[in-house]
């Protein structure tokens, strides 16, 4: 009889548990400023390039259109983004940051850095760099997105 796997001793198990813990921390931290954790990633994309099409945001974040639509509705409700139809394609919409959405960036960055510091407390600078590299490789494996050295 084959020996049963000890899930708790696998990298996948640890990664899943750390991801869950981080996600919960992200929700708490961003909730303090009225955001849900996933919405932050939409804002990150718009800070890189404002006026993206909704479908492009979904593609960049590897999320479904309904999921992005729900996130955008929440961001519109709290006046961080607006949605505009394209003149040349009535089926397509572009998403733009509002003034408030642009102004919130600094505050959100502060919250993010605090979250990151809490997450990495206890790791040396070298361990942080190694972790960053390894997570970049895992991201590349799952999404085809280049890792930190490939950008």
Which residues does each PLM region occupy?
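Central "turn" residue of the DNA-binding helix-turn-helix
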Residues: 50-51, 62, 124
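N-terminal leader segment of winged-helix/HTH proteins
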Residues: 1-33, 151
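Charged, amphipathic alpha-helical coiled-coil/dimerization segments
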Residues: 23, 73-136, 140-143
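Short, locally clustered residues in the helix-turn-helix/winged-helix DNA-binding domain
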Residues: 19, 44-48, 109, 136
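Key DNA-contact positions within bacterial/archaeal DNA-binding proteins
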Residues: 40, 66
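Pre-recognition alpha-helix immediately N-terminal to the DNA-recognition helix
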Residues: 14, 25, 41-44, 103, ...
């Amino acid at each position: 009889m084959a020996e049963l796997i000890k899930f708790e001793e696998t990298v996948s198990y640890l990664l899943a548990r750390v991801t869950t813990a981080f996600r919960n921390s992200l929700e708490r931290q961003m909730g303090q400023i009225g955001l849900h954790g996933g919405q932050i990633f939409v804002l990150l994309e718009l800070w890189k390039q404002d006026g993206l099409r909704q479908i492009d945001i979904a593609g960049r974040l590897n999320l479904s259109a309904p999921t992005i639509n729900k996130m955008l509705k929440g961001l519109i409700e709290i006046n961080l983004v607006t949605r505009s139809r394209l003149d040349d394609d009535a089926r397509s919409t572009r998403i733009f940051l509002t003034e408030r959405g642009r102004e919130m960036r600094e505050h959100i960055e502060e919250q993010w850095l605090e979250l990151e510091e809490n997450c990495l407390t206890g790791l040396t600078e070298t361990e942080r760099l190694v972790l960053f590299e390894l997570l970049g490789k895992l991201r590349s494996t799952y999404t085809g997105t280049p890792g930190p050295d490939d950008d």
